[in-house]
Amino acid sequence: MRKILILFTVLFVSNFYAQDILPLKERAKFVNKLQKERFNNLLPELMEKTGIDMWVLIAREYNEDPIIKTMLPPTWLNARRTTIIVFSLDSETKNFESVAIARYAFGDNIPSIWNKEKQPNQWKALKDYIVSKNPEKIGINTSSYESLADGLSKYHYDQLYNVLSPKFRKKIVSAEDLAIAWIETRTDLEMTAYSQLVEISSAIIREAFSTKVITPGVTTTDDVVWWMREKVIELGLDTWFHPTVDVQRKDESDLYAFDNNSKFDTILPGDLLHCDFGISYLTLNTDTQELGYVLKPEETSAPDFLVNALKDGN
């Protein structure tokens, strides 16, 4: 009998999926709560730590700054028109304020303060707000090294620069450290959710590496990749990056795991399977690599050394 040994518990996890993946409306409520905590509790700490007392983020609809994309309200799929949000932290009183200088409030968490009747020009309204706060530094998303911190377009930079007086132009600095800190720091609530993402990712891998999906001698690694993509869509999730599934065997095929031919390798008994897989859910992403072994016809279990290795590796 051709069998695949998965060196973690093989479960068909339809009940797991059904019970633990939230409907879209419930996801939106959770993300809104998550973002509120990040804006009100985490961001002031990061601004103080990185020495930025004002952070100006600007994006155009369908051309979003990568940082703004992480802040979008759950009911927004894109920025709207020209979206400007400003975070300010008083260095003395530690009062924190987040505002939108835009046509609309930025979801439930950031109100719009732009009075178009009083000041119809959006950029002048931004200038007026900056002047009222008189920050020591005006952080913007420009960076020579970090792509995620380099989301401000040349046009928007010019608009900001030109509307400010020389006094405030001198205060413009890169918010690179703050942007990266925002991206890399997770709250306790996010870590609770993240453990669920990891479980979902591993459950998909368990199913992908089972006889439900793989028939040794017939199924190719590329077949498994596309099954994983389809499974993610079926669950109402997103794939963070195109998965990789490759085989490692004595013929050194593992040396060519990322070339154009190896993705069509037929999975055989005795193969060590490797995958690199990630999903996106609740504004978080996973990047998971796990291994599995395909039993040879005469085997009832994997070699002991492999069992021990995969216990550590998986």
Feature locations, PLM:
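Bacterial Sec-dependent N-terminal signal peptides
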Residues: 1-19
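Active-site neighborhoods and metal-handling regions in enzymes and metal-associated proteins
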Residues: 19-314
